[in-house]
Structure formats: C-alpha cells, structure tokens
Amino acid sequence: MTEFFMGLGLSYEWAWGISTIAGILLIALPLMLGVAMIIYADRKIWAAMALRRGPNVVGPLGLLQSFADGLKVFLQETIIPTAANKGLFLIAPIITFTVALMAWAVIPFNSGAVLANINVGLLYVLAISSLGVYGVVIAGWSSNSKYPFFSAMRASAQMISYEVSIGFILICVVLWAGTFNLNDIVKAQQSHVWIINGFVANPLLFPMWVMFLISGMAETARAPFDLTEAESELVAGYQTEYSSMAFALYWLGEYANVLLMCALNAVLFWGGYLPPLDIPVLYLVPGFVWLLLKILFFFFIFSWVKATVPRYRYDQLMRLGWKVFLPVSLLFVFLVSGYLMATGHFA
C-alpha cells in the first residue's frame, strides 16, 4: 500500500503514514462491525440453548439489536461515583478497548495481508494481551467499591495464572514452526499431516490446542471462567460502577478479545487462512473467507460452552491452571523438543 501512495507522487514518509492509517481503519472498522454482529450471535445462540427466541424485534431478524443497544448507551449519562478516582476511572475502559484492538495488528488475514508483518508477531500478541489486565485492575481500584476491587483481584490472578500455561503451549508451536512470525507459522502448517493443513492434526500438538482453547476462555474471562463478573457474588464485577459509553467500551473490548482468541486458535493450530485440506480446488476460495469461517466456528464453541457449562469455583479455576495445565504444558515442551531433536528437524 505504501508503494501505491508513493506512485501518486507522495514522499515515503507521507505514503507510509497514510498507508498505516488506512490499514488500521481497514482492520478496526470491520472488527467493530464484527463485534456488533457476534454480540447478536452470542445472544441468539444462548437463546436457542434455552429454547428462547432471542433478539427478534429491532430490524430484520433482530439484526439491528446491537446497534440499538449502542445508541442507547451512547445517549446515557456517564455516572462517576463520588468516592472514585475520576481520572483512572475513565481511562480504565479506554485501556481495555485500545489493547484489544492493538493485538489485531499482527493477525494475517491472507498471505501477506497483515498490518504489521513483524518477526516477533506471536511475542507481540502475548505482550499486548497481557496489558489488558491493567484496565480491569485500574477499574477495580479506582471505583473505590468492594465488588469491583474483589473482581480486579480475581482478574489479575486468573489472567496471570493462565498466561503461564499459554506461554508453554505457544513454545510448542514455535518449536515446530521455527518462527515467531504468524504468517510463517500459517505457512508451516500446509500439508502438515498428509493433506491436512493445520498443527491440530499432529498428535503432539492436538492436546496443546485443547488446552489453548480452554486457557483462552479463562484468559478472556468467558464462562465457565467468568469469575470476574460472577453476578451471584460480585454483582457485575469490575463493571459494577460503570455506565454509558465507559461500560460499552468494556463490552466491545471483551468481545474483541474473544474474537482475537478465536483468530489465534485458527492461525496457530488450524491453518489460519489456508483451507482445511491441501486440495487445489479449495484454494479458489479467498484465504480471508477460510479464516472468517474458522473464527465463527470457534466463537460458536465459546458460546456453546457459555450456555451449557456451569461456572467454576475460584479454587477450581486456580487448581486447573496451576496443577493441571502448567505441568502438562511443560511436559509437552520437553516431548516436542525431544521429538524434533530425535528426528533431526529441530528448528
């Protein structure tokens, strides 16, 4: 895109700046539209599981319900508790929302179609996604209320606990692919096992995908790991004191993170923008379509689990992360490393 603007007579600096802004808009605007649609889909799936109809009034089939909700919160007043730290209280949801968007910069939507094709893309995702907990912790502390504070403590412990096992899982992927570049990781999955595109067909990496999927639910605080928003215990958790657009930013950030986790499942284990099978006719379908279908598939799994699995207790959540996922993921790091060294394919 930079070359295109340079061809119009612009200097490199101007062309790079305009192309970067255009790339950000090309990702951010469809992402926000996608978030609105998956909120609608989430409510529809949850309703279907409970034998209800779900949103069905605003627009055809209720498709405009999310936009109506957005307009409603936009017109509401932002109420700040008198005892709250005003500056931190308002900046916390902005941090969560901004961090959720920044992580998408390195997701490859097709071969070469990525905003920032950096060599440490996976490390970038880990670093940026780790910053999301600051928005939650700041909200819990600045609200000066016991329910948000308890929620913030839970959120920090939960996210840190599962980031450790996620790190070991991603080490297995990096060892096999030999790179931190997400685009190269996708290419390394082509015909990985026979004609199957994806590390998920690998017996050593399939358990890692299952653990990554579950850890992703815990990392994004989705049910059954939504201990930070346990209504029966913490009202609405760290969001209890929020209203209007500040509350909406948390919702947008939460669902953007869920979509990001679905995209990472697709990119790291299911071949990303590659078709499921390495068959020439399947490559006629554009790569971004395959990636979108995989993201929707994983989002359905997230919603399905949310509607069917009861919430974990806090001690069960910690036990699963530290006593099950951590040792198992560490064991598989040794297994994958040993296999690659024994077969002479160590990257």
UniProtKB/Swiss-Prot annotation:
One of its GO terms (cellular component) is plasma membrane. Its EC number is 7.1.1.-. This is NADH-quinone oxidoreductase subunit H. The gene is nuoH. The chain crosses the membrane at residues 21-41, 87-107, 120-140, 160-180, 194-214, 259-279, 282-302, 324-344. PANTHER family: NADH DEHYDROGENASE SUBUNIT 1, NADH-UBIQUINONE OXIDOREDUCTASE CHAIN 1. NDH-1 shuttles electrons from NADH, via FMN and iron-sulfur (Fe-S) centers, to quinones in the respiratory chain. The immediate electron acceptor for the enzyme in this species is believed to be ubiquinone. Couples the redox reaction to proton translocation (for every two electrons transferred, four hydrogen ions are translocated across the cytoplasmic membrane), and thus conserves the redox energy in a proton gradient. This subunit may bind ubiquinone. It is an enzyme of class 7 (translocase). One of its GO terms (biological process) is aerobic respiration. It is found in: Cell inner membrane. PROSITE patterns: COMPLEX1_ND1_2. NDH-1 is composed of 14 different subunits. Subunits NuoA, H, J, K, L, M, N constitute the membrane sector of the complex. It catalyses: a quinone + NADH + 5 H(+)(in) = a quinol + NAD(+) + 4 H(+)(out). It is a multi-pass membrane protein. Keywords: Cell inner membrane, Cell membrane, Membrane, NAD, Quinone, Translocase, Transmembrane, Transmembrane helix, Ubiquinone. HAMAP family: NDH1_NuoH. The lineage of its organism: Bacteria, Pseudomonadati, Pseudomonadota, Alphaproteobacteria, Sphingomonadales. InterPro entries: NADH_UbQ_OxRdtase_su1/FPO, NADH_UbQ_OxRdtase_su1_CS.
